[in-house]
Amino acid sequence: MNRRHVLGLAGAGLLAPHVVRAQGFPDRPIRLIVPWPPGGSTDTIARLFQPRLAEVLGRPIVIDNRGGASGATGAIEAARAPSDGSTWMFVYDTQATNETVMRLPFRTMEAFVPVSLAASGPLVMVAHQSTPFTNFQQVVDAARRAPDTLNFATSGVGGLAHVSTTLLQQQGNFRIVHVPYRGGGPAVQDAVAGHVPLFMTNVVIVSQHIRNGVLRPLGVTTRAETRHV
């Protein structure tokens, strides 16, 4: 292969083994870079796919978490790896947006070969149980009364959660303060602890906390309700 392989977050790529076998494949473990810390949605889903990928590819899969800079740190590491098929990356939406918000030493579509879409799901805005909010309109009303006083967490700058919440603010004429984290894992920890009142994220990492009543769903980015919240 002349480019690194990317497995996108949003069924494991059954075409991948045929592609790599046709071009020769290293007889050693595959390094699967997850450009986020452990505990977030990308890491969680990558670990769900890990056994199946190892079975299909016929090689051990070693997950390497390289969090930082909204996924850019891990992506740079992956781009610098030998283009021999031994390094793959499991990505999230920021791989599509990072080039627009920061300077990278590569062009994403030139440095990587997309393999497969792995999972998809809606974003959800949640509030800690200690807040008075039970729906998103209440957040809008509070933010209009006192702009820039409510904080909301995301997994990092430039991700879909950040971009979509910024768009909501522009369209809804209200302002809340973005608190970017170094991944969904650290962000959900602070959201559950009540250190940040609002958290915009995907459903995967908060569904259990919603069921337990620690986090309260205020709205989802779908036209219809989702069974996960």
Where are these regions (language model features)?
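Extracytoplasmic "Venus flytrap"
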Residues: 32-45, 69, 154-160
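Short helix-initiation/N-cap motifs at beta->coil->alpha
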Residues: 66-74, 121, 179-189, 202-205
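Hinge/capping helix and adjacent helix->loop/strand transition within the periplasmic-binding protein
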Residues: 80-86, 100-186
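Alpha-to-beta junction loops
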Residues: 81-89, 147-149, 192-198, 214-216
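C-terminal lobe and pocket-closing loops
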Residues: 120, 134, 205-229
